Amino acid sequence: MAKLHDKYQETVVAELTQKFGYTSVMQVPRIEKITLNMGVGEAVADKKVMEHAVRDMTAIAGQKPVVTVARKSVAGFKIREGYPIGCKVTLRGERMWEFLERLVDIAIPRIRDFRGLSAKAFDGRGNYAMGVREQIIFPEIDYDKIDKIRGMDIVITTSAKTDEEGRALLDAFNFPFKK
């Protein structure tokens, strides 16, 4: 079992119940899933780029990503409907907790010029979205084997009803928000 999951069950539930006055343990917000998305627009010109992106995402997430395709043709971007333009992976359960642990303890501290995560990136329903500019902050990525530095979006979906509850939940997991 991941350390963060144990921490959630042992201390976070009690803290949030006391802070927000929940009457049932089931009302306490929890992390439902983490979605990683990597847009790879260059894949239109070179098919090899997508293979590298999928390989990197597989190493980071621990499971094979789904290749996303263009929904409609856009002449300005030289893409047609059905062209592969990215990949995404949804983590739940044990893999989600392990990824969250690596993100908070290892990856975020390795971000260059890091001054804290923006607290304004909540969506109004307690979900948090963040962008990562370089995939090399993750220890699974070997710097010598990457073809190009790529970023990705990380969305943490919670069962929280408000941003305040979502922030309290992520604060309990030691997310480094700006003060």
Swiss-Prot record:
NCBIfam families attached here? PRK00010.1
Q: How does it assemble?
A: Part of the 50S ribosomal subunit; part of the 5S rRNA/L5/L18/L25 subcomplex. Contacts the 5S rRNA and the P site tRNA. Forms a bridge to the 30S subunit in the 70S ribosome.
The text of the family note is: Belongs to the universal ribosomal protein uL5 family.
GO MF entries: RNA binding; rRNA binding; structural constituent of ribosome; tRNA binding
| InterPro entries assigned to the protein according to its UniProt record, in alphabetical order | Ribosomal_uL5 (IPR002132), Ribosomal_uL5_bac-type (IPR020930), Ribosomal_uL5_C (IPR031309), Ribosomal_uL5_CS (IPR020929), Ribosomal_uL5_dom_sf (IPR022803), Ribosomal_uL5_N (IPR031310)
What protein am I looking at?
Large ribosomal subunit protein uL5
Top-level taxon of origin: Bacteria
Q: Report whether Lipid metabolism shows up as a keyword of the record.
A: no
SUPFAM superfamilies on file:
RL5-like (SSF55282)
Disulphide-bridged cysteine pairs: none
List this protein's GO terms for biological process: translation
Function summary: This is one of the proteins that bind and probably mediate the attachment of the 5S RNA into the large ribosomal subunit, where it forms part of the central protuberance. In the 70S ribosome it contacts protein S13 of the 30S subunit (bridge B1b), connecting the 2 subunits; this bridge is implicated in subunit movement. Contacts the P site tRNA; the 5S rRNA and some of its associated proteins might help stabilize positioning of ribosome-bound tRNAs.
Q: Encoded by which gene?
A: rplE
* Record GO cellular component, one term: cytosolic large ribosomal subunit
Presence of keyword Ribonucleoprotein: yes
UniProt keyword terms in alphabetical order: Ribonucleoprotein, Ribosomal protein, RNA-binding, rRNA-binding, tRNA-binding
